[in-house]
Amino acid sequence: MNIKLTLLVLISIINLMIIQPIQTLAFPIYAQQGYENPREATGRIVCANCHLAQKPIKIEAPKTVLPNSIFEAIVKIPYDTNNKQLLGNGIKGSINTGAVMILPEGFKLAPKNLLSEELREKTKNVYIQPYSTTKDNILLVGPLAGEKNQEIIFPILSPDPSKDKNIHFLKYPIYIGANRGRGQVYPTGDKSNNNPIVSLNTGKVTKIISLEKGGYKIEIEKDNGEIYTENIPQGLNLMVSQGSQVVANQNLTDDPNVGGFGQTEIEIVLQSPSRIKGMIVFFFTVTIAQIFFVLKKKQWEKVQAAEINF
């Protein structure tokens, strides 16, 4: 199983590198490699450690589901499709998306052979994988081309308490984390080029040198007369010019990040079929009783009217 999973991941990565060679920072696999569980004890999903900007996401799923049934959980990752992100080589490219879904124990990705034709069509070309062989209730997907995947459909199979005594007919939480665009920090802790460059010291910009391969070198004279150099990578726009006065931690460039990460949660009820049948019988009985009560009341009113007339 581990070999098959590894091969599938490698094939996915190779395909993505061929199609989108630079868009690698949205890989949820980074969380997979670094954390046994993507949700910390505080409730924070670890993807937020690399994707520092916060952006909204939404999830749509049924309020209740029956055991051993397949349902859709739709994750919505909105963003302006006119925006382009800064890629690793300093050029602008399309934004990608990715998501992690943490299901209750027993819930898992629905096998493809159980999907309806409609659901199979909706989820084609979207590779969703379990977080690990021991955590098949945690699902990962991405990176995906964002233009076509601002909505990601997860086909979920609910558990059956009659087959698993650890599962009960209860209300359960589902946790979702999703990102659009690249992160600002690598798993190693190093910053990516998807950050603004800030001045390390207070001083004056004395020289700006445009580099042949793109980017700049900025020479800044500190208050004590010492000159130091700030290196600006390709793709960032300068916010200072020669002669500008700068202070420590002032942005020398714009912020290239157009993406961000968001997380949310919903609740879903695993409903007992016998309870539903019982409720139907109860409501049917109450309805019949009310009908008989109304008929009896009308009959009594007729008797009363007849006695008055007599």
Swiss-Prot record:
Keywords: Chloroplast, Electron transport, Heme, Iron, Membrane, Metal-binding, Photosynthesis, Plastid, Signal, Thylakoid, Transmembrane, Transmembrane helix, Transport. The keyword Transport applies. Residues 1-26 form the signal peptide. Its main location: plastid. The chain crosses the membrane at residues 276-296. It is a single-pass membrane protein. One of its GO terms (cellular component) is chloroplast thylakoid membrane. It is found in: Plastid, Chloroplast thylakoid membrane. GO terms for biological process: photosynthesis. Heme binds at residues 27, 47, 50-51. Its cofactor is heme. Binds 1 heme group covalently. SUPFAM superfamilies: Cytochrome f subunit of the cytochrome b6f complex, transmembrane anchor, Cytochrome f, large domain, Rudiment single hybrid motif. It comes from the Eukaryota. GO terms for molecular function: electron transfer activity; heme binding; iron ion binding. PANTHER family: CYTOCHROME F (PTHR33288:SF10), PTHR33288. The 4 large subunits of the cytochrome b6-f complex are cytochrome b6, subunit IV (17 kDa polypeptide, petD), cytochrome f and the Rieske protein, while the 4 small subunits are PetG, PetL, PetM and PetN. The complex functions as a dimer. HAMAP family: Cytb6_f_cytF (MF_00610). Component of the cytochrome b6-f complex, which mediates electron transfer between photosystem II (PSII) and photosystem I (PSI), cyclic electron flow around PSI, and state transitions. Belongs to the cytochrome f family. This is Cytochrome f.
